[in-house]
Amino acid sequence: MTATLERRESASLWGRFCDWVTSTENRLYIGWFGVVMIPTLLTATSVFIIAFIAAPPVDIDGIREPVSGSLLYGNNIISGAIVPTSAAIGLHFYPIWEAASVDEWLYNGGPYELIVLHFFLGICCYMGREWELSYRLGMRPWIAVAYSAPVAAATAVFLIYPIGQGSFSDGMPLGISGTFNFMIVFQAEHNILMHPFHMLGVAGVFGGSLFSAMHGSLVTSSLIRETTENESANAGYKFGQEEETYNIVAAHGYFGRLIFQYASFNNSRSLHFFLAAWPVVGIWFTALGISTMAFNLNGFNFNQSVVDSQGRVINTWADIINRANLGMEVMHERNAHNFPLDLASVEAPSVNG
């Protein structure tokens, strides 16, 4: 009898926990994805803050020349970063217990792997939580689909690119100047500016910004006035009201006369689908481009491709970009190698003795 009561008590306790996790009445929805998301994102955030402030220098290139990234070791907010895991570790899974000591783990950049892997799990679970809440509320799943674009971008630079290059040391540093360094080196090694998928991503981001600004300004300029001229137009509305707050026909007419008729939408659903799809598809393409360049399927290279009838090179902007790429490549990791591979004219001598 006692065992039966205990089983019922535990079952009801588990049932109450399940109801609480999946309840849409909570101020913040938890969800089953949230059960994983909360600890992983808290871990990533906590380790990031501690490491950004106090982590010792990391031997990123695996050549016993550690690079400082934390505030206590001479950096500021702009120059500081979580330095990627050492090239000596490569793609090995490197938790704290795999190192001989905590000092060794810090020296080899263990915090970077810890942060990136927990962050990746966290953002994937956040995307799943968006779908889960939409499902509970009877909504369509497109919010999670839109969020998949930044998830794909983060996955590309933090996971796919290091896997393709063979080491977490090639991942993007977690800091402002570290991000810029990653971008410059990426251009030098992969000519990303000449990759069509990057061009689509630029069109997606800048186009999305332009369309959002146009949409917001058109909506706020075509509000349906519910007040007198002596009162603010904002006083005529309440949050969540069923009636429309702006006149899409007026906005459509204005924009159609400003550009041409078919440049504007007269259907609200089509308009908002376009506003969502344009930047999302652009960022999807950028993430796909990073993922292909991770395996050295690089941007277009027109190096010395234009010649005259005598065989002399006619320099183009593409040649100038290539020269800039070579200059950037010889500047980075200057002590890890003597020359970049594409500047070496002969094979390296044997070191077997």
UniProtKB/Swiss-Prot annotation:
Pfam (any one): Photo_RC
Site, as annotated: Stabilizes free radical intermediate: H190
Residue numbers binding pheophytin a: Y126
Site (Cleavage): A344, S345
Positions with a binding annotation for chlorophyll a ChlzD1: H118
InterPro entries referenced in this protein's UniProt entry, alphabetically: D1/D2, Photo_II_D1/D2_sf, Photo_RC_L/M, Photo_RC_L/M_CS, PSII_D1
Residues engaged in binding a quinone: H215, S264, F265
DNA repair in keyword set: no
Residues with site note (Tyrosine radical intermediate): Y161
Enzyme's top EC category: oxidoreductase
Propiece span(s): 345-353
Chain ranges passing through the membrane: 29-46, 118-133, 142-156, 197-218, 274-288
Phosphothreonine: residues bearing it: T2
Enzymatic reactions: 2 a plastoquinone + 4 hnu + 2 H2O = 2 a plastoquinol + O2
Membrane-topology descriptor: Multi-pass membrane protein
Protein's cellular compartments: Plastid, Chloroplast thylakoid membrane
GO molecular function: chlorophyll binding; electron transporter, transferring electrons within the cyclic electron transport pathway of photosynthesis activity; iron ion binding; oxidoreductase activity, acting on diphenols and related substances as donors, oxygen as acceptor; oxygen evolving activity
Keyword field: Acetylation, Calcium, Chlorophyll, Chloroplast, Chromophore, Electron transport, Herbicide resistance, Iron, Magnesium, Manganese, Membrane, Metal-binding, Oxidoreductase, Phosphoprotein, Photosynthesis, Photosystem II, Plastid, Thylakoid, Transmembrane, Transmembrane helix, Transport
UniProt keyword annotation of Ligase present: no
Function according to Swiss-Prot or TrEMBL: Photosystem II (PSII) is a light-driven water:plastoquinone oxidoreductase that uses light energy to abstract electrons from H(2)O, generating O(2) and a proton gradient subsequently used for ATP formation. It consists of a core antenna complex that captures photons, and an electron transfer chain that converts photonic excitation into a charge separation. The D1/D2 (PsbA/PsbD) reaction center heterodimer binds P680, the primary electron donor of PSII as well as several subsequent electron acceptors.
NCBIfam families reported for this sequence: psbA (TIGR01151)
PANTHER family (UniProt xref): PHOTOSYSTEM II D2 PROTEIN (PTHR33149:SF12), PHOTOSYSTEM II PROTEIN D1 (PTHR33149)
Miscellaneous comment in the UniProt entry for this protein: 2 of the reaction center chlorophylls (ChlD1 and ChlD2) are entirely coordinated by water.
Annotated protein name in UniProt: Photosystem II protein D1
Gene behind this protein: psbA
